[in-house]
């Protein structure tokens, strides 16, 4: 919803793949796009960029930081109405899933239980596919860095080395 109604998208290293956009022609139809990517071939390949910027994301964002800080210091936006709208939509359309009639476990239920058992201190890693979407929806992530996934990159085999790295970082 926030993408669909946005008037500006700042896309950093985004491929605008169909897992992010759905039907590209209908994605964020009113938004101007600032597309930052180190690979010039990616900019504008799927979604037109009004402001194409070729460069390393770290360098580009460091260059932008003073302007962002200046704008934020002038007037902090009031998001109260936006949060009220989002919360009303969450209430009207809660996440859920149908329990199977055949006595089998639903994968959404299993993932939800894994999240409950792991709790807020756990770090979760997901591979690519439907389980990645369910894990994003049915596990409650309460701290930064606790959800490791390859996003729209579609990298099969990501989850095992990501989980190993997480264990090394937080034994």
Language-model segments: residues:
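Active-site diphosphate/adenylate-binding microenvironment
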Residues: 85-170
């Amino acid at each position: 919803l926030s993408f669909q109604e946005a008037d500006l998208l700042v896309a950093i290293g985004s491929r605008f793949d169909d897992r992010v956009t759905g039907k590209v022609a209908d994605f964020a139809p009113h938004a101007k796009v600032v597309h930052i990517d180190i690979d010039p071939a990616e900019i504008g390949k799927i979604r037109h960029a009004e402001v194409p910027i070729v460069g390393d994301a770290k360098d580009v964002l460091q260059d932008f930081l003073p302007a962002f800080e200046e704008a934020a210091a002038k007037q902090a936006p009031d998001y109260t109405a936006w949060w009220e709208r989002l919360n009303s939509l969450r209430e009207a359309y809660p996440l859920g899933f149908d329990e199977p009639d055949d006595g089998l476990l639903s994968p959404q239920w299993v993932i939800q239980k894994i999240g409950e058992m792991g709790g807020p201190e756990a770090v979760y890693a997901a591979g690519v596919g439907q389980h990645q979407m369910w894990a994003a929806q049915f596990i409650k992530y309460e701290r930064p860095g606790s959800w490791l996934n390859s996003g729209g990159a579609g990298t099969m085999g990501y989850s095992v080395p990501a989980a190993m790295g997480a264990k090394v970082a937080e034994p």
